[in-house]
Amino acid sequence: MSKAYLFIYDSNVGTREELKSVLNRMQRVSTWRFDVPSCFYVISEYSAQQLYDEFVSLNGTKGRFMFIEASDNRQGQMLPETWYLLTNKQHKPK
């Protein structure tokens, strides 16, 4: 079963471009998107621990970061595409 995560990081972890490359190489990541600084929305069938382990194997432990599951208890000012991804665990059809 797919889960939605927020991947939150500081600038010591890497640039957005570097992290896009890491997420694209992660076999445990189904898809992802971003629309705010220092945060990616990640979809995966794996646990936060498993995502962490794979991320560290590719990028190391530099900086501060975390994968945190996005529950249904959420609200905010986000783009419709972000809400769709978090709710449906896939990108909104074009």
PLM feature spans:
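Short aromatic-glycine-(Arg/Gly/Cys) micro-motifs in beta-strand/loop hairpins
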Residues: 13-31
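General N-terminal targeting signals
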Residues: 24, 57-59, 82-84
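Short S/T/G/P-rich N-terminal loop/turn motif that feeds into the first structured element of a domain
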Residues: 1-18
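Short, intrinsically disordered low-complexity segments
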Residues: 29-76
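Short, surface-exposed loop and linker segments with low hydrophobicity and enrichment for Pro/Ser/Thr
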Residues: 1-5, 61, 93
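Short, low-order "capping/linker" segments at domain edges
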Residues: 49-54, 76-94
